[in-house]
Amino acid sequence: MSAREVAVLLLWLSCYGSALWRYSTNSPNYRIFSTRSTIKLEYEGTLFTEWSVPETCFVLNKSSPTTELRCSSPGVHAIKPIVTGPDEEERYLFVESSHTCFLWYYRVRHFFNNFTQLITVWAYDPESADPDELLGNAEEPSINSIVLSTQMATLGQKPVIHTVLKRKVYSSNEKMRRGTWRIVVPMTKDDALKEIRGNQVTFQDCFIADFLILLTFPLLTIPEIPGYLPISSPRGSQLMASWDACVVASAVLVTDMETFHTTDSFKSWTRIRVPPDILSDDERRSVAHVILSRDGIVFLINGVLYIKSFRGFIRLGGIVNLPDGGITGISSRKWCWVNYLLKAKGRRSTFAVWTENEIYLGSILLKFARLVTTTELKNILSLSVTATLTIDRVEYTGHPLEIAVFLNYCTVCNVTKKIFLVIYNEDTKQWVSQDFTLDAPIDSVTMPHFTFSALPGLLLWNKHSIYYCYHNFTFTGILQTPAGHGNLSMLSNDSIIHEVFIDYYGDILVKMENNVIFYSKINTRDAVKLHLWTNYTTRAFIFLSTSGQTYFLYALDDGTIQIQDYPLHLEAQSIAFTTKDKCPYMAFHNNVAHVFYFLDKGEALTVWTQIVYPENTGLYVIVESYGPKILQESHEISFEAAFGYCTKTLTLTFYQNVDYERISDYFETQDKHTGLVLVQFRPSEYSKACPIAQKVFQIAVGCDDKKFIAIKGFSKKGCHHHDFSYVIEKSYLRHQPSKNLRVRYIWGEYGCPLRLDFTEKFQPVVQLFDDNGYVKDVEANFIVWEIHGRDDYSFNNTMAQSGCLHEAQTWKSMIELNKHLPLEEVWGPENYKHCFSYAIGKPGDLNQPYEIINSSNGNHIFWPMGHSGMYVFRVKILDPNYSFCNLTAMFAIETFGLIPSPSVYLVASFLFVLMLLFFTILVLSYFRYMRIYRRYIYEPLHKPQRKRKKN
């Protein structure tokens, strides 16, 4: 070999590992990749000669390592750089012919006085936008964007904000201002995922793409404090990170130089610094694990937990019920479930802490409790007392209420150990041992990551290989490579696994320490090597953006970080084209609009899923559920075949068929038939080329705490808002007290009273509401009672008029049966018995008032005619088959009117007595007069005085 050839070889070897090429567009997250897009090509290395592109594509400067590419025709285009040396990888770019050309841009202002957010929206063209718009830094639209938005508005464009979870819609109520629309939405934490949508309006044959955004309460980064010192991982270690499962834009990254905190996917960030007097220099450089929680950033350093928050930097130990040392690991939730059904009191945990022998669960406000010890686990799992059992890992599963515990078990712990798996449910408090056992070297380190699925599924990896368990541990094995083995290090220059990334679509990225990436999908057995995107020496980490796309974060040598969008699906398509991997079906659809459904008594959920596939392949949809067996299913399948393709549609109805009436253990039966069920749809065959692996959603059977009832026509508006007192006459009270009752009318609780003439009958109309507003009128039976004990009212229907065959339940009879209970608990759905059967109850007096009301029986409340009064009623749904919730509401009625005149007979009697008394007095006075007259007729009343003679 000549000296020149040796020099060339050495040059090539020095460049090997750093020579690569990539591409980008002006559209964020590669959302528009079409014939209209400008594709920027970039070669990183020193051996570049020129670009090789097909004839249908045009390169601005073919001999420049950095240039622009446009492809005028859609399809798959082979692009690669020509270099001096071994050929570089050829990519197959899928260029679309799309009429989606424009994007939405938004800015947000927060108003804490009324907890709203003002979203300013405009349309922009990525091919003609200002640099600030492309970088996401623009505060106002550019001239081109103003013109575009104004033109679109003239054609009828008006964006709205759709919330993904609660399906609410917000629109602009203002006129357009300088090419922008302004939309006000409320701040929320449980409906943060939103989408900007526009009308189907075109300009120059182009539409605006819908845009997914994440809006929560404003999040702040922890500020840097002068004089504080950096905290980092050990020198030379790989990057570690943690993020909020429901707000992926909020994340923390630990490098061997600094720790960075962000709330906007690292578009901006702050460095985390700690006081100089708490940790030594070695401790500050010894971060082993990190967790981002709502209370702050939790660091694990030398077996001790520390937390950095806005309040400072403190050590966590005995003050929060945690060990002061010996902690071996911490973990947090990976998947976001905003809604879930938790029957037990309390909160679910947000992260786990463990030592070799103990597990602690933590929730918000740094509340920790010990969950279990290995000694207790030996008893629970019936393991040998003499065997060695230690806690290997604790990981949250894809289920919102379950935690997986990996246990190391051995009797003679010299060479190998067995790894067992048990799952703990935070709601039922039950431990379930799984059909999972793995033999491993005694000193091996394995890392688990559960998938987003209804049935438990996970990936478990060591330095070189990945072990998969899908479909509740029934589909297992080692992830294979095209080389026929499962050792990923052999295909990545002996590098070891650094990160395993899984998204909600089932994509799996295995990143090696040298940035070689392997790609797989859940429910598949193999992985393929993707094109090199980042050079071997750059320290990188893969994150998920708020739009559901992936991006790389690079830690640079100068102590800063940088982000770069990663076109995962374009890269996967390129490899699939090379390997001729095809999805076995053409389309997989469903109408599951939510990820969380509530089913109450008497309700059913009907959904459908459809698969389109080539003839003679026999595909179908698999429906799987996980959780308590509390739901019944009905299936209906329809099939169509045309033009060589088959369409199979499966319609499912989930329901309950339980009668809760006349059962002795009402509450126990309710509890047995409530719970959380996870359901997933997946095709019977699958490959890495398929877009979505499966559809996962929850069905919660039980009481929706956002459901309530109210009485139609009653509100807290339309009256003077004030509390006042009034007196109830003791004779009007049910329990007959010895004195009158003075009560206070609490307006904030009772609302405005309805004023009725006491000649008017009243039938309450009960309405059902949830957090979205009015749902329907309630047709079920309900009862009412006056909360202060008044019983001077009645009902117009008798038991006989209502169709009773025996004596119905009344407040009087129920109080007699349940004297030990307060009034509001003596009668309810748990002890309700109807009166429409001869087999139940006793005949009794059917002329009594019927005290049960519904919307159709015409039963009304009527009032006493002799006096007015204030009545505060509580209404309760009585039907035991209506709801799992104890639905009650309050309303107040004030009666008024003229006191009615007495009857004619009473008046006549009174007048007769009065006349009789008058004539009696008259006669008596007559006889008295005559007696006096007769006595003095001859004798004057006043005798004259005679004068005496003087002697």
Curated annotation (Swiss-Prot):
GO terms for cellular component: CatSper complex; sperm principal piece. Glycans are attached at N61, N114, N414, N472, N487, N493, N535, N796, N854, N881, N886. Belongs to the CATSPERD family. The chain crosses the membrane at residues 904-924. This is Cation channel sperm-associated auxiliary subunit epsilon. Keywords: Cell membrane, Cell projection, Cilium, Disulfide bond, Flagellum, Glycoprotein, Membrane, Signal, Transmembrane, Transmembrane helix. PANTHER family: CATION CHANNEL SPERM-ASSOCIATED AUXILIARY SUBUNIT EPSILON, CATION CHANNEL SPERM-ASSOCIATED PROTEIN SUBUNIT DELTA-RELATED. It is found in: Cell projection, Cilium, Flagellum membrane. InterPro entries: CATSPERD/E, CATSPERD/E_C, CATSPERE_b-prop, CATSPERE_Ig-like, CATSPERE_NTD1, CATSPERE_NTD2. Component of the CatSper complex or CatSpermasome composed of the core pore-forming members CATSPER1, CATSPER2, CATSPER3 and CATSPER4 as well as auxiliary members CATSPERB, CATSPERG, CATSPERD, CATSPERE, CATSPERZ, C2CD6/CATSPERT, TMEM249, TMEM262 and EFCAB9. HSPA1 may be an additional auxiliary complex member. The core complex members CATSPER1, CATSPER2, CATSPER3 and CATSPER4 form a heterotetrameric channel. Its main location: membrane. It comes from the Eukaryota. Residues 20-903 are extracellular. Auxiliary component of the CatSper complex, a complex involved in sperm cell hyperactivation. Sperm cell hyperactivation is needed for sperm motility which is essential late in the preparation of sperm for fertilization. It holds the Pfam family CATSPERE_Ig-like.
